Amino acid sequence: MSSDGSAGKAVVEAKGLNPGLIVLLVIGGLLVTFLIANYVMYMYAQKNLPPRKKKPLSKKKLKREKLKQGVPVPGE
């Protein structure tokens, strides 16, 4: 009786991979592919796109920065 039970387990184990493992491998593969694609696009953008322009400073902020540096502001 015990030989029948172990033979049944051997057939089930030899059947194939665990479905949970397959799902895990597929999700892991997609995640790795996504990360590699993001890195490749990032490197491409660094080489080919111009640098971002800074936002223009308002006149108040410009005056404040110049006063901090000790540069006389024109018009005052």
Curated annotation (Swiss-Prot):
Biological process (GO), any one: regulation of DNA-templated transcription
Similarity field: Belongs to the S1FA transcription factor family.
UniProt keyword list: DNA-binding, Nucleus, Repressor, Transcription, Transcription regulation
Stored Pfam families: S1FA
GO cellular component: nucleus
Gene that this polypeptide is encoded by: S1FA2
Location within or outside the cell: Nucleus
Domain of life according to the entry: Eukaryota
UniProt name for this protein: DNA-binding protein S1FA2
Renumbered ranges of motif Nuclear localization signal: 50-55
Organism of this sequence: Arabidopsis thaliana (Mouse-ear cress)
